[in-house]
From Swiss-Prot:
Enzyme type, top EC level: transferase
Free-text comment on the cofactor: Binds 2 [4Fe-4S] clusters. One cluster is coordinated with 3 cysteines and an exchangeable S-adenosyl-L-methionine.
Domain TRAM: 377-443
Reaction catalyzed: L-aspartate(89)-[ribosomal protein uS12]-hydrogen + (sulfur carrier)-SH + AH2 + 2 S-adenosyl-L-methionine = 3-methylsulfanyl-L-aspartate(89)-[ribosomal protein uS12]-hydrogen + (sulfur carrier)-H + 5'-deoxyadenosine + L-methionine + A + S-adenosyl-L-homocysteine + 2 H(+)
Function in brief: Catalyzes the methylthiolation of an aspartic acid residue of ribosomal protein uS12.
Keyword Hydrolase assigned: no
UniProt lineage: Bacteria, Pseudomonadati, Pseudomonadota, Betaproteobacteria, Rhodocyclales
Primary localization: cytoplasm
Name the UniProt record assigns to this protein: Ribosomal protein uS12 methylthiotransferase RimO
Entry EC no(s): 2.8.4.4
NCBIfam families hit by this protein: 30S ribosomal protein S12 methylthiotransferase RimO, MiaB/RimO family radical SAM methylthiotransferase
Gene: rimO
One of the record's GO cellular component terms: cytosol
Length: 443
C-alpha cells in the first residue's frame, strides 16, 4: 500500500541532527533535492517521504536519532535514514525495520538514489529553483564551510573514522567557489569546519590548485589567506594542535581571519593523553598559547575536555585544572566520558564511576567559570565590531569576533533601532556576566 500524497510536485520532509558537519551534509542533500525539482516540506503530513540525517557519536545521540526515526515513521510512514548512525544499519533496522533505506554519512548520491527509487523526481527541473549558494539550514548571515571529510587520527574515544573514513580534502577551487557564492549571497561569516581542519591537504600532499587565475596550495594557511580576501568574517573550528597552526596566527593579527581558534585539547595529563592517542604535551601547548597571544593579543581560544576517561585519577584531573589555570582559555566545554559502541577506549582498564565522571565535569566547569569571566571583564571599556544575530523590541543580540554561534556567548545591545540580522555594528563594551557581554552603540 502506498502512502504517496496526490499533489503534483513531490515533497520531501527533512530532519537534521548532530554536529555542524552533519548540518553541512544536510545542506548538500537539500540543495540536490531542490535542484531536481523536489519541494521541501516543513511538516510530516505534507511530505511524500522524510529523510532523517542522524548522529551516532555517543549513546545519547544514538537514542535521539532512533527516536527521531520512530517519530517520522509514526507521523509519515516513509523514511530514508542517512548520517553517522547509518553506518550501523543493523542498529537502525533492528529498531525500525520498516525504513525505506539506510545510508552512511556524507552520502548525498546514495540518498538521492533512494529518493529516486521511492519518489521519482519531477520532469524538467529548472536550475533556477536553487540559489547559487545552495540550500542552507543556518540563518542567512552565516554559514558552515566544510573543507574535508573523515579523519586520519585514531583517538580511542572516537568512532568517527569508522563512520566517515580517512581524511579526504575537498579541492581548494571547490571550497573557494562555494565560499565566494556564499559571500555573494550576503553571508557575513563563514565557519570553517571538518573532522580535522588543520590536516587540510595532507591526503593530497598539499597539491597545488588554482583560484582566481593564481596557484593556491591545498593547505590550511593558503586556504585561510584566500578566504580572507572575501572581506567577511572567517572563523576556524576543530583545529587539531599541529605546529602548522602557528602559521595562522599572523593572519589573525593582520585581520584577515578572525582571532579565534577552536582547539579540542581534550586533556592535559600526559598519561591520559597517551591513553586517548592524542599527540599533545601540556607544557608545549602552554608555550604555544603564550606565543600565539604574544603575536595576536586579541586571540580567543575555545577548547573541549573529557573528564572521567578510563584510568583518570584525581592526580590526572588536578593536572587538567592546573593546565586550565595556566592556559587561561577564553571558552571551555566539558563532557563526562561516555562509552561509545565500537570505541577502543571501551577496552581500557580502570573505568571511572559515572558519578565521579560527572562530579569532575562539574568541578572543571566551576573552575573555568572564574577564568572565563575574568577574560570577559578585561574587555569592558573596549570598542569592537560585532555581528548582529537577532533584533526585537528589547534590543539586539550580536556576537563579537570571540563568539561563535550557538556555542559561545552573545553581545547584548539595548538599542537595536535600525539594526537587522547580518549587520556589522561598532560598540563599546560596558559590562559582562559569566557568559555574555553588554554594549552600547558607538555613534
Amino acid at each position: 500500500m502506498s502512502n504517496i500524497k496526490t499533489q503534483d510536485v513531490p515533497r520531501v520532509g527533512f530532519v537534521s541532527l548532530g554536529c555542524p558537519k552533519a548540518t553541512s551534509d544536510s545542506e548538500h542533500i537539500l540543495t540536490r533535492l531542490r535542484a531536481e525539482g523536489y519541494e521541501i516540506s516543513g511538516s510530516y503530513d505534507a511530505a511524500d517521504l522524510v529523510v532523517v540525517n542522524t548522529c551516532g557519536f555517543i549513546d545519547a545521540a544514538v537514542e535521539e536519532s532512533l527516536d527521531a526515526i520512530g517519530e517520522a515513521l509514526a507521523e509519515n510512514g516513509r523514511v530514508i535514514v542517512t548520517g553517522c548512525l547509518g553506518a550501523k544499519d543493523d542498529v537502525i533496522l533492528a529498531a525500525h525495520p520498516q525504513v525505506l533505506a539506510v545510508t552512511g554519512p556524507h552520502a548525498t548520491e546514495e540518498v538521492m538514489q533512494a529518493v529516486h527509487r521511492h519518489l521519482p523526481k519531477p520532469h524538467d527541473p529548472f536550475s533556477d529553483l536553487v540559489p547559487p549558494q545552495g540550500i542552507r539550514l543556518t540563518p542567512q548571515h552565516y554559514a558552515y564551510l566544510k573543507i574535508s571529510e573523515g579523519c586520519n587520527h585514531r583517538c580511542t574515544f572516537c568512532i568517527i573514522p569508522s563512520m566517515r573514513g580517512d581524511l579526504v580534502s575537498r579541492p581548494i577551487h571547490d571550497v573557494m567557489r562555494e565560499a565566494e557564492a556564499l559571500a555573494d549571497a550576503g553571508v557575513k561569516e563563514l565557519l570553517v569546519i571538518s573532522q580535522d581542519t588543520s590536516a587540510y591537504g595532507v591526503d593530497v600532499k598539499y597539491r597545488t590548485g588554482f583560484w582566481g587565475g593564481k596557484p593556491v596550495k591545498t593547505r590550511l594557511y593558503d586556504l585561510a589567506n584566500a578566504l580572507g580576501e572575501l572581506g567577511i568574517w572567517i572563523r576556524m573550528h576543530y583545529v587539531y594542535p599541529y605546529p602548522s597552526v602557528d602559521d595562522l596566527i599572523p593572519l589573525m593579527a593582520e585581520g584577515k581571519i578572525l582571532p579565534y581558534l577552536d582547539v579540542p585539547f581534550q586533556h592535559a595529563s600526559p598519561r591520559i593523553l597517551k591513553a586517548m592517542k592524542r599527540p599533545a604535551n601540556a607544557e608545549n601547548v602552554l608555550e604555544r598559547v603564550r606565543k600565539w597571544r604574544e603575536i595576536c593579543p586579541d586571540l580567543t581560544i575555545r577548547s573541549t575536555f573529557i573528564t572521567g576517561f578510563p584510568g583518570e585519577t584525581e592526580e590526572d584531573f588536578e593536572q587538567l585544572l592546573q593546565f586550565l589555570e595556566a592556559a587561561q582559555l577564553d571558552r571551555v566545554g566539558a563532557f563526562a566520558y561516555s562509552p561509545v559502541e565500537g570505541a577502543a577506549a571501551n577496552d581500557l582498564p580502570d573505568a571511572v564511576p559515572d558519578e565521579v565522571r560527572e562530579e569532575r565535569r562539574a568541578r572543571l566547569m566551576d573552575f573555568q567559570e572564574d577564568i572565563s569571566t575574568q577574560r570577559l571583564e578585561a574587555k569592558i571599556g573596549r570598542e569592537m565590531t560585532v555581528l548582529v544575530d537577532d533584533v526585537d523590541e528589547e534590543g539586539a543580540l550580536a556576537r563579537s569576533p570571540g563568539d561563535a554561534p550557538e556555542i559561545d556567548g552573545l553581545v547584548v545591545i539595548p538599542d537595536g533601532e535600525g539594526l537587522a540580522p547580518g549587520d556589522f555594528v561598532r560598540v563599546r563594551i560596558t559590562d559582562c556576566d559569566i557568559h555574555d557581554l553588554y554594549a552600547e552603540r558607538v555613534v
